[in-house]
Amino acid sequence: KASVGFKAGVKDYRLTYYTPEYQTKDTDILAAFRVTPQPGVPPEEAGAAVAAESSTGTWTTVWTDGLTSLDRYKGRCYDIEPVAGEESQFIAYVAYPLDLFEEGSVTNLFTSIVGNVFGFKALRALRLEDLRIPPAYSKTFQGPPHGIQVERDKLNKYGRPLLGCTIKPKLGLSAKNYGRAVYECLRGGLDFTKDDENVNSQPFMRWRDRFVFCAEAINKAQAETGEIKGHYLNATAGTCEEMMKRAIFARELGVPIVMHDYLTGGFTANTSLAHYCRDNGLLLHIHRAMHAVIDRQRNHGMHFRVLAKALRMSGGDHVHAGTVVGKLEGERDVTLGFVDLLRDDFIEKDRSRGIYFTQDWVSMPGVLPVASGGIHVWHMPALTEIFGDDSVLQFGGGTLGHPWGNAPGAVANRVAVEACVQARNEGRDLAREGNEVIREACK
């Protein structure tokens, strides 16, 4: 008679995938999940289920398990810790062997780690709080096309935050008038203007017309001010081919920077564009449209710091990162946490800032965080203090809303940022004397 190889039936995940004795390897990809199990599901089982379903596991033993080495390939839940103040919630730490992931593919990384497991019945909710990307994996990515230092050298702008402005009204202007608004802002003293994330190629303004008029505006403003100027030309499109066509046209016009919506456009498209940008000397501005769909819920989804790390690997020179100003204090530390993850080489684990793992980017270029959305001149001292020099501050309504027009609005922003930087360099406390600094600058 045939010998029985294994027992059929539903298996407890924790027998295989919960391994508290496991010592993590330097090459492992580590994940911190906030798990809210269904009533009656023990934490070990829920944590193990997450590890299993996001790596090798299925709900039962299959005979092909005998053809592979589970020990080599399985994800492991190696630690579980309760969340302070939450009864039925805990953080599950999962280690994934490096070989589970395709090199240089953020798409594959996400498909594995967050692809399937979030719809799992045994869990009420699941949130990916942080990922530790080992150098062995991050080294397979190009990363940002240029990074902070190269961007400053290209633009010849040092020692202060860069200034931008989103052209409003975002939809409905003709290409010619759009270019006119761009010119006014750049002439007034901004470094960049920006296409709104949803400006692609609509009936009232086709992309090619916009690109041509914006290039004209940039050249005119550069000639008048003697400074290098840019406009984030949004290359996001319905197909990757069309996106590349727009990026190539931008390069032919000789503009310094293009833009992409990396979440709606997708990581595959974004990585292709980032490679093109590095090969052709274009800077790449990244907008995070759709991020709140993924990161806004406290108990479910994915924290933005994970999306930020993914963007640094996929590639972008700027990415939107919230403003802090006017939000809660606690938000400030967390925002600064992922701002550091974008800019720095080495970031220590620091739970108070939401950083669950020490992250070593080795030599991958940094990304400039962009503060944008509802900010204006009076926020400038706070922004300068919070973000420091390596940032882009974007004032849409805060420039175009100036009662005298775009150029005076731009002048106001430029004067304010120069005043704040000077005051800070002279040792004044921007948090306390900020309003005074701005008032003096007004004169």
From Swiss-Prot:
Function field: RuBisCO catalyzes two reactions: the carboxylation of D-ribulose 1,5-bisphosphate, the primary event in carbon dioxide fixation, as well as the oxidative fragmentation of the pentose substrate in the photorespiration process. Both reactions occur simultaneously and in competition at the same active site.
Entry binding sites for Mg(2+): K194, D196, E197
Subunit structure: Heterohexadecamer of 8 large chains and 8 small chains; disulfide-linked. The disulfide link is formed within the large subunit homodimers.
GO cellular component: chloroplast
Annotated catalysed reactions: 2 (2R)-3-phosphoglycerate + 2 H(+) = D-ribulose 1,5-bisphosphate + CO2 + H2O; D-ribulose 1,5-bisphosphate + O2 = 2-phosphoglycolate + (2R)-3-phosphoglycerate + 2 H(+)
This protein's name: Ribulose bisphosphate carboxylase large chain
N6,N6,N6-trimethyllysine found at: K7
Active site (catalytic residues): K168 (proton acceptor), H287 (proton acceptor)
Gene: rbcL
A GO MF label: monooxygenase activity
Cofactor note: Binds 1 Mg(2+) ion per subunit.
EC code(s) of this entry: 4.1.1.39
PTM notes: The disulfide bond which can form in the large chain dimeric partners within the hexadecamer appears to be associated with oxidative stress and protein turnover.
Top-level taxon in the UniProt lineage: Eukaryota
